[in-house]
């Protein structure tokens, strides 16, 4: 369970020095710091459940979400998340894993996000179409649809059969919010598959 320093200090208020007690408990592995002011009580909590608490507003996307949905064959160990108007990439290394955050356009940010629950944890993750749009937004403009198709199938290793399952209408609707030639080309490419 995620707890703030204030919550833990309140729980430890009967001790003479709650801050010292918290520090000792963290050193003994009873609490695990996620970032300054935030702790997790269970060392075995999957990293993706913590991503939204580290930096936000954010949601899981890019390679991690594509792997989550089985679009790309590789396992992704860094939890990749989308943010907006932060102006720079952020990276956090914790005992739970590595977390990276990067911007997408603010108009695109609220589109295509799912809120999921796992036990007592809630987390936000991009729908598969949105994760692919976010991923392509980070790529330098590709010259044509053929190069885009090669990028999708060779670099990202997405099977053509998986591309055909995507909701083309959603991607075409999302493309207006990104102002990205790659996403416009993806819309056009998917209409022809």
Predicted regions and their residues:
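Short, compositionally biased low-complexity segments
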Residues: 25, 33-35, 102-109, 147, ...
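Accessory alpha/beta interaction modules
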Residues: 59, 63-75
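Short beta-edge/loop segments at beta->alpha junctions of small alpha/beta modules
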Residues: 1-63
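Residues at alpha-helix termini
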Residues: 27-28, 67-68, 177
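Short coil/loop linkers at secondary-structure junctions
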Residues: 15-18, 72, 181
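Hydrophobic/aromatic-lined pockets within catalytic cores
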Residues: 13, 70, 137-141
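Hydrophobic alpha-helical interaction segments
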Residues: 113-193
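Exposed, interaction-prone assembly regions rather than primary DNA-binding/catalytic cores
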Residues: 70-127
């Amino acid at each position: 369970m995620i707890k703030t320093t204030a919550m833990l200090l309140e729980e430890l208020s009967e001790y003479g020095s709650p801050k010292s007690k918290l520090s000792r408990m963290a050193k003994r592995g009873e609490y695990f710091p996620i970032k300054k002011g935030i702790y997790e009580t269970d060392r075995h909590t999957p990293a993706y459940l913590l991503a939204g608490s580290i930096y936000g507003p954010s949601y899981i996307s890019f390679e991690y979400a594509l792997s989550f949905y089985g679009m790309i064959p590789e396992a992704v160990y860094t939890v990749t998340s989308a943010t907006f108007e932060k102006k720079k990439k952020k990276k956090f290394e914790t005992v739970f894993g590595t977390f990276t955050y990067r911007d997408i356009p603010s108009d695109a940010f609220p589109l295509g996000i799912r809120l999921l629950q796992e036990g007592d944890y809630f987390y936000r993750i991009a729908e598969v179409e949105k994760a692919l749009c976010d991923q392509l937004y980070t790529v330098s403009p590709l010259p044509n649809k053929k190069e885009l198709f090669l990028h999708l199938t060779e670099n990202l290793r997405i099977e053509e059969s998986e591309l055909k399952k995507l909701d083309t209408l959603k991607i075409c609707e999302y493309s207006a919010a990104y102002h990205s030639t790659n996403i416009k080309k993806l819309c056009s490419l998917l209409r022809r598959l």
